[in-house]
Amino acid sequence: MGKGTGSFGKRRNKSHTLCVRCGRRSFHIQKSRCSACAYPAARKRTYNWSVKAIRRKTTGTGRMRYLRNVPRRFKTGFREGTEAKPRSKASASSA
């Protein structure tokens, strides 16, 4: 039997599983290394020959739960835990 179409029916073991850092199914179980982000290496795997891939994965393509609010909070100098001063009646009646 060759390595072509007939052999694909015999392939039943997963070599890759989910990566805890990038979430893709690229973590090689035996090597303990992610082929997409190079986890557990400290530096994330990116190459400039795959500009399109960088564009797909870069900041801004996901939820950005924290980063989405930073520009708004920056305007007020990241103040927290304060209450707005009550407006005076003069400005309220003129409006």
Curated annotation (Swiss-Prot):
Pfam families in the cross-refs: Ribosomal_L37e
The Basic and acidic residues compositionally biased stretches are 77-86
**What cofactors does this protein use?**
Zn(2+)
ZnF (C4-type) intervals: 19-37
Give yes or no: UniProt keyword Magnesium. no
Q: Can you cite an annotated GO cellular component?
A: cytosol
| SUPFAM superfamilies found in the cross-reference section | Zn-binding ribosomal proteins (SSF57829)
Where is the segment annotated Disordered?
73-95
PROSITE patterns annotated for this entry? Answer: RIBOSOMAL_L37E (PS01077)
Could you state a single Gene Ontology molecular function term? zinc ion binding
Q: Does the keyword Zinc-finger apply?
A: yes
- Cofactor note from UniProt? Binds 1 zinc ion per subunit.
Question: Which Gene Ontology BP terms does the record give?
Answer: translation
Query: Which residues does the annotation say bind Zn(2+)?
Result: 19, 22, 34, 37
Q: What role is this protein assigned? A: Binds to the 23S rRNA.
Q: Which family does it belong to?
A: Belongs to the eukaryotic ribosomal protein eL37 family.
What is the name attached to this protein's record? Large ribosomal subunit protein eL37x
